[in-house]
Regions:
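Beta/alpha (TIM)-barrel catalytic core signal, keyed to glycine-rich beta->alpha loops juxtaposed to Asp/Glu
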Residues: 54-213
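Active-site groove signature of glycoside hydrolases
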Residues: 39-61
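Metal-dependent catalytic neighborhoods of phosphoester/phosphodiester hydrolases
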Residues: 1-3, 27-28, 59
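A short, structured active-site edge motif that brings together acidic residues
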Residues: 11-23, 49-51, 112
Length: 213
């Protein structure tokens, strides 16, 4: 990674990384991990750094000051080695509330799974409302729910095309996100050039959904 990035001026790209909280064995290794990440990337700072995967499994460890995770990462931000500090949430709204009550005033963004299926199914609506109350911008992962929203049952696709004949089915998921002012960043996994070109075409226009849609 470092060799690839070294070809470009540091200010010409954004670089994000995360503390791997999915493994509880990492909780006492924040300094070791962070320094190794910087070294691997060959940079002096990260533009964005996340407390990764805040969920039921690790919330107690994240909140345990004995591990020193928050204190260390906040200190790195104060030194300019992290430009923006945030977190990704994979658990319930209640878990997010616990994390925010402890660290919310220092969080600059939050990444959640958000799409029109999980709006109700995983209470993404409630999570967006919670982040809005804290004034924290929303980053989106799984906008197409692993590709499941890129193609629908024929009858459902027909309903969408009746409303927007020129709109790709997958684009509806992105138009839904464009309807939410809290959303500032959308992360979309793309496996080929065609998908990249379609996403670029979709986001070249701002066409949020109307009420009836």
């Amino acid at each position: 990674m470092g060799r690839a990035l070294a070809k470009y001026p540091r200010e010409s790209f954004y670089l994000a990384d995360k503390f791997p909280g999915y493994d509880l064995a990492n909780m006492d290794k924040v300094e070791e991990i962070f320094e190794a990440q910087l070294q691997k990337c060959g940079v002096k700072y990260f533009d964005f750094y996340l407390f990764h995967n805040v969920c039921e499994m690790n919330i107690d460890a994240y909140l345990d000051e004995a591990h020193g995770i928050f204190a260390y990462l906040k200190a790195q931000r104060d030194k300019g080695r992290i430009r923006h500090l945030g977190f990704s949430a994979h658990g319930s709204r209640a878990v997010m509330e616990r994390f925010l009550n402890a660290y919310g005033k220092d969080m600059e963004f939050c990444q959640i799974q958000l799409n029109y299926l999980d709006w109700d199914f995983q209470d993404a609506k409630g999570k967006v409302e919670l982040l809005k109350a804290w004034g924290i911008p929303v980053w989106v992962m799984e906008p197409l729910r692993g590709g499941k929203l890129a193609s629908l049952a024929p009858a459902d696709e027909q309903k969408l095309r009746a409303l927007r004949p020129d709109e790709d089915v997958a684009a509806w998921a992105f138009r839904f996100l464009q309807s939410l002012p809290e959303v500032k960043v959308v992360l979309s996994g793309m496996s080929n050039l065609e998908q990249l070109e379609k996403n670029l075409a979709t986001f070249s226009e701002d066409k949020p959904l109307r009420g009836e849609e």
